[in-house]
């Protein structure tokens, strides 16, 4: 009916789980789709609860997919002179943004390993995460443990940096990861955020302060 009324229409619909399958009648809601998709096991601790994203990441991803579908539909309509219907689902969107994790699991059988420390990601090398300081928090991304150990003057961390187990030894690697986080936290806790970030920056460590919304709004960036 719509294309009869407007033969140039580009129509996009968004569902929860697609238009087929046993999940079809289920409510399509961000938290529920996060939980269904496996994403909630990508962070947190081994003995802790699954960890959903606090922002509506599934809704956001699906809205971007819908926007891209509209743009692709306009191109197809203009080239072929036909109306276009595109279908987007919340589930497809959250699977797309997990493509790295899911394909790794499917090709190797391995999953992200949550540990005793609250990892920011179950897939990343330590000390990928957030740590407390005397006056706030510091986030550390992919970085050299040896460089961090030198800046923090930590012999414990320097020793851990040279004793990383073989990647194929999951049990030993997990034990090593669990050992790294508390040592980094112990070294950072008595230090101030600003000067520590500056020192880590100078050593090539990817890091930054963890800010509140008020901090963000006041920042000159």
Go through each PLM region and give its residues:
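Proline-centered helix-kink/hinge sites
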Residues: 7, 206-209
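Short, solvent-exposed turn/loop segments enriched in Gly/Ser/Thr/Pro and often Arg
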Residues: 15-18, 213-219
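Acidic-histidine catalytic/liganding microenvironments
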Residues: 6, 154, 219
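Active-site-adjacent "lid/gating" segments in soluble enzymes
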Residues: 3-143, 150
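Short secondary-structure transition/capping segments
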Residues: 24-25, 170-172, 219-221
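A structured beta-alpha segment of the ubiquitous adenosine-cofactor-binding alpha/beta core
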Residues: 1-4, 189
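Active-site-adjacent capping/gating segments
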Residues: 117, 124, 215-221
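Aromatic-enriched alpha-helical interface/lid elements that frame and gate functional surfaces
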Residues: 122, 126-207, 214
């Amino acid at each position: 009916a719509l294309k009869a009324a407007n033969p140039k229409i580009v129509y996009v619909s968004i569902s929860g789980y697609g238009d087929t399958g046993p999940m079809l009648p289920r409510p399509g809601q961000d938290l529920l789709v996060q939980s269904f998709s496996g994403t909630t096991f990508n962070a947190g601790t081994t003995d802790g609860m699954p960890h959903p994203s606090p922002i509506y990441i599934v809704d956001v991803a699906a809205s971007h997919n819908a926007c891209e579908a509209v743009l692709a539909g306009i191109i197809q309509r203009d080239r072929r002179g036909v109306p276009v219907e595109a279908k987007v689902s919340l589930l497809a969107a959250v699977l797309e943004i997990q493509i790295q994790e899911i394909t790794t699991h499917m090709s190797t059988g391995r999953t992200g390993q949550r540990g005793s420390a609250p990892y920011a990601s179950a897939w990343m090398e330590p000390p990928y995460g957030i740590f407390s300081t005397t006056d706030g928090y510091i986030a550390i991304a992919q970085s050299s443990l040896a460089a961090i150990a030198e800046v923090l003057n930590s012999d414990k961390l320097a020793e851990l940096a040279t004793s990383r187990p073989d990647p194929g030894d999951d049990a030993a690697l997990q034990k090593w990861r669990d050992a790294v986080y508390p040592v980094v936290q112990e070294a950072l806790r008595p230090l101030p955020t600003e000067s520590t970030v500056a020192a880590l920056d100078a050593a090539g460590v990817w890091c930054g302060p963890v800010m509140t919304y008020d901090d963000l709004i006041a920042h000159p960036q």
